[in-house]
Amino acid sequence: MADDRVAILTEDEEELKRKHLERFDRLSLEIQSPSQPPENDVPNDTAPTPSPQHELSCCERLFLRVNRHLLVSKVFYLFFYAAYGSLHPLLALYYKQLGMNPTQSGLLVGIRYFIEFCSAPFWGIVADRYRKGKAVLLFSMLCWILFNAGIGIVKPPIMACKEETIPTTTKVPTVHPTPSNETFFPNTSSTSQMRRRRDLIGQYPWRTILSSGQSSGYISEHRIKRDSNLSFTPAPEELANTTQTNQTSTTTQPKPSTSISTSTPSSTNTTSSSTTKSTTTNPNLPPPEYNMDQVNAIFLLILLVIIIGEFFSAPAITIVDTVTLHYLGPHRDRYGLQRMWGSLGWGLAMLCIGIWIDHTSTNLIIGNMECIMKNYKNYHIAFIVFGVLMVIALIVATQFKFDVQHHDTNEGQEVGNQQENVQPRGSPGTRSTDTPTIVQAEEFHFWDLMRLLCGVQYSTVLFVAWFMGFGYGFVFTFLYWHLQDLTGTTTLFGICSVLSHVSELAAYFTSHKFIELVGHIRVLYIGLACNTARYLYISYLENAWTVLPMEVLQGITHASVWAACISYLSAAVPPPLRTSAQGILQGLHLGLGRGCGAMVGGIFVNYFGVAETFRGIGMASLVILLIFSLIMYITGQNEKKEDKMLAENIPIPSSPVPIATIDLVQNTADVAAPARPEPKLPARKTQHQQEQEDLNKPAWVPSGSPWVSVALLVYQIREMVLLAKARPTVEVQPLQGTDEVRSDSQEDQSPPVFSDAVQNENTPSGLQDHSGSPTAQLDVPTRDTQPPSQHIS
């Protein structure tokens, strides 16, 4: 009985503590009542279940540990990225087989990133404003299926084989000066393919004889122009009679024979031999000739389909990322565990499709000449598999729960709590007894962020991020193009995809330790050096299969560099502007960088070739590495200390860095105070801003779609403009350089309040105030004067 009472008291204390922390807008450290567990809270994938473990089998315990909401996200990522990986890496090769040049192929691949960069924020705002997230998601998935299938049903252009022959010569019969009724016998003893110079002296009697013989097929005093592309050989009946080394007739003086190449068969009324035309084909089949008018028409048609389809299909992955982050709640650092299933599906689908296409390659017969185009790839298999997998992803997408009511309820509770904290102060005859007035410590604006990023140190980091995105887009578009020129197969492409995605996953989950070990800037050095080695190695390839060792560097050149850039900028800017900084970085790296890599790289490939372009980008990477290291050496004199400081600011998901926050709360008293105007309340922070200011959350997560932060950036700017128009100017009190807090009025006789806030020595130089953390908040003392009480959270 005593134990039950203790348990009840413990539950009541926990409930009171939770309400007390929510009132002051502090992050609740998962203090929940055991009797009333929340229904919509999703703690993690590995939360223990209350069922008895000894009565369940291993498989049952495994299924019980998996959250159902996050299981939907995992399955969606698996099938969506499996569909994407089965088709889109091969689209450049499909365009090449349709007869397009590298410029056209690069434009069709790269324009997707620019359209997605513009349309994803638009659809995100529409879905949030009208609360139609699920409808927009399903419509976007349907557009993925229809418009990508439309690319596959485009009728290919007409192809014609180019005829090539081995040059041969035709031996004209040796003519002797005989009467017109005598038979001409050809000299068929010579089988040499060499042509001999005509004897001008011996040519004159020939012309006389041919002109005097009216039965001859040659026109007198005229020579027929020789065709350089056609060749003639003696007739088969003439070849059958070549049993003697030299066949002659009863003539007086034989003249030397000549080699004349004609385009018409020779025939006479006498018994003469006629030559027939025979062609000799090259065993190496030439590439087919495309009808360029049809190729250009197909290019414009596919370009129109991509522009329309990508505009409507762009918000799909953005909305799913948002829902998944909502499922995770405060455990956003586990986003990588959900997104990794997409990388797994991409690699496996690409490998299977590559093997399947290799085993179903056909020899295309063109025209009546039966010109065979070897190793003609049937890419319709990829389109069919893409459609099937995307339909499955569409079915899975119907299971997402857009809990708008619960989200609105939480926002309403937050507003209600803030109104409860404010209402007693404005009511007549009432006095605030336990609620302090919180004044925002410091307010940062978007232009402050732009002024920071335009500095030499951070602008060079942004340029490196753009260049790495440029290289990633070029490799995604033209690596398989180059390997196919080296007789690489689609099976090789699948193996390359598996290796690159495995290396990216390993790099994502070890990036924190890697950055902490060497520092942010040195990670960028290593990424540029690996880019140089990789591109130069690819440019000198002679065997396509030797590219496999360099595909392991994809994790360093993409994943590690991406994580280092996000972490570096996140630690440099204050938390209220962290989302804006990440949106700018993602737009430069994944939007503008990848798009320029595909489009500009296609122009370079069209003019210089694939290998030469790889070599040029590799040398450019080396030059940028040298310039970047020189700039960092000049601007960052204490680089080692700064990198160590930034690495320490990255909280580890398993053991976040504890940060002590001391709140100075003024209690009530019966001492009367003179009346004074009430201070203006600060602007209400949105839920997203509160999540961004939470220092217990990691500075970066492996992002699956870059447009989530871009949409939030646009929405945040719009919200700032509306708030600035709606509310009057709020007087903001800056942080004090000393520990003394000034009173709000000269008439206030309350003693000064001293703060013992803990300052973080590892805060990087940026927009943050010199007195401490940018999220530090001061509680202004009220009119009631009593000793302040300290609350540590």
Curated annotation (Swiss-Prot):
Q: Name one GO cellular component term.
A: plasma membrane
Q: Name one GO biological process term.
A: antigen processing and presentation of exogenous peptide antigen via MHC class I
Q: Which residue intervals are annotated with compositional bias (Low complexity) in the record?
A: 170-179, 241-283
Record PANTHER family = MAJOR FACILITATOR SUPERFAMILY DOMAIN-CONTAINING PROTEIN 6, MAJOR FACILITATOR SUPERFAMILY DOMAIN-CONTAINING PROTEIN 6-LIKE
What is the gene name? mfsd6a
Q: Can you say what this protein is called? A: Major facilitator superfamily domain-containing protein 6-A
Output the lineage of the source organism: Eukaryota, Metazoa, Chordata, Craniata, Vertebrata
User: What is a single Pfam family found in this protein's UniProt entry?
Assistant: MFS_1_like
Which family does the UniProt entry place this protein in? Belongs to the major facilitator superfamily. MFSD6 family.
| Listed Polar residues bias regions | 180-193, 415-434, 757-776, 783-793
